[in-house]
Amino acid sequence: MRISRREKRKQWIAGAFGVCAAVVADQLTKELAYRNLKLSGKGFATLIPGVLELRYLENRGAAFGMLQNRLPLFILFAAAVSLAAVICYIRVPDSRRYLALRVCMAGLTAGAVGNLIDRIFRGYVIDFIYISLIHFPIFNVADICVSLSAGLLLILMLFVYRDGELEIWTRSGSQDGKDEKKG
């Protein structure tokens, strides 16, 4: 079932607002980490002993610190992911059924843009959230956006959408998620 123009406009505004809010939250928390952890000389703060800490880290690599010092590659990759997510957002059929898919694309865009801003203006990504309980790699708000969106996207693809239903990336014309038959 297609949505009304008004509903579509609301989804677009909500998506744009969500991306902007997530990017602002990411950049603000990174700036707070920079000022309160790095500049103060502390480097870390314990929030919940044995569970959650804030640890300042300048990540010059990819996810979880892999592939260090490949800045041009990471800038290109983050820009490509952002562009691909926006294109997918645009191509998602106008139906409430695909709202979760739009949320995934918005989250991927926000996360990619948040870390892209760091790479362009700092030359590295600020990571600061550390779950000491499980010794998980240090991460940031943008990483949360990407990870949650990718996880939800995987769940949607495996359990919600049927085979062929997500051909929206390769097909032109159809806006309701159903194959168009010609001839």
Model region roles, listed by residue range:
Residues 1-183:
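Alpha-helical transmembrane bundles and membrane-interface segments of multipass inner-membrane proteins
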